[in-house]
């Protein structure tokens, strides 16, 4: 049974500006594993797209939980990739199944998270 659904849309340029003001912004949003992936991306635009996608996914996750960021921290949620490259939530505070989708189009990243109670 679905117990939560969250969606977030984020402008890549806004996250890029936040990162340019303070590069520690990435450390605030990303876990150690996510940060390794981020630093391994050589193309700056692709790097910002990755960071924005993870931001949007974590915001969507917090909305699906019904708490928003604050009650749950960015580092409480980790999104890596499965063997096919699709995003996969690998660390989370929810005790059930979780599903995430991240899309990029133009100057935007969008994410959707569904939380499902296990029977």
Curated annotation (Swiss-Prot):
Database matches in Pfam families: ACPS
Assigned keywords, A-Z: Cytoplasm, Fatty acid biosynthesis, Fatty acid metabolism, Lipid biosynthesis, Lipid metabolism, Magnesium, Metal-binding, Transferase
Disulfide bonds: none
Gene3D superfamilies registered for this protein in UniProt: 4'-phosphopantetheinyl transferase domain
Gene Ontology biological process terms from the UniProt entry: fatty acid biosynthetic process
Task of the protein: Transfers the 4'-phosphopantetheine moiety from coenzyme A to a Ser of acyl-carrier-protein.
Family: Belongs to the P-Pant transferase superfamily. AcpS family.
Protein's name in the database: Holo-[acyl-carrier-protein] synthase
Organism: Streptococcus agalactiae serotype V (strain ATCC BAA-611 / 2603 V/R)
